[in-house]
A protein has these predicted regions:
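Short alpha-helical hairpin
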Residues: 22-27, 62-68
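A ubiquitous short alpha-helical element
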Residues: 32-37, 54-55, 78-87
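Mature-region segments of soluble proteins
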Residues: 44-48, 66-172
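Post-signal-peptide N-terminal segment of Sec-exported extracytoplasmic proteins
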Residues: 49-64
Length: 172
């Protein structure tokens, strides 16, 4: 190795170690951008939709397992801007339909009223409504089935799938 390249690399590393703590010390929750895709009004609405799709029974529901946060994260990080707009428009449609049909917010409706609204969206001829319902339902199932609670307590997740237990004893 050349001495000049080694000294240059060493100087860069030392400079980085000196500057990094002062740069990172200014980070806090107010200076970082919010990671949520939805607004403060839309987040509980999505949680209610998710809770309607997989409600709490003798096992925790989708809302309790944080599936609404999973959906936001997936759509924000893995889907395109069209899907993000579909989610926002779909939530607005859910709220509008609820107010038109029952005269109250979707989050204030009982379980039967919520199911009625979501079934109507699933059977709708409107591509945006149907696309929203299909996307949210699929992500709800995916998030619920891949949650820690379901994987460990319901489906009995095995770290080594299809392990082979021989029928002949092995002698050492």
């Amino acid at each position: 190795m050349e001495r000049r390249a080694a000294l240059k690399g060493l100087a860069t590393a030392i400079g980085g170690l000196v500057v990094l703590p002062s740069w990172a010390s200014n980070w806090n929750h107010t200076t970082l951008q919010p990671t949520d895709l939805l607004s403060a009004e839309e987040t509980p609405l999505l949680a209610s939709v998710v809770d309607t799709i997989i409600p709490k029974t003798d096992t925790p529901g989708a809302k309790e397992l944080g599936v609404d946060r999973f959906i936001q994260l997936m759509i924000k990080d893995c889907y395109d801007s069209k899907a993000q707009e579909t989610l926002k428009k779909g939530l607005a449609t859910v709220e509008e339909d609820s107010k038109e049909t029952f005269g109250k917010s979707f989050t204030a409706c009982n379980a039967a009223q919520r199911i009625h609204i979501l079934e109507g969206m699933g059977l709708s001829d409107d591509a945006t409504s149907k696309g929203f319902f299909t996307m949210v339902k699929g992500l709800t199932i995916q998030g619920y089935m891949s949650s820690e609670y379901v994987m460990t307590n319901i489906t009995k997740y095995e770290m080594i799938p299809a392990r082979w237990n021989g029928c002949v004893p092995v002698n050492q």
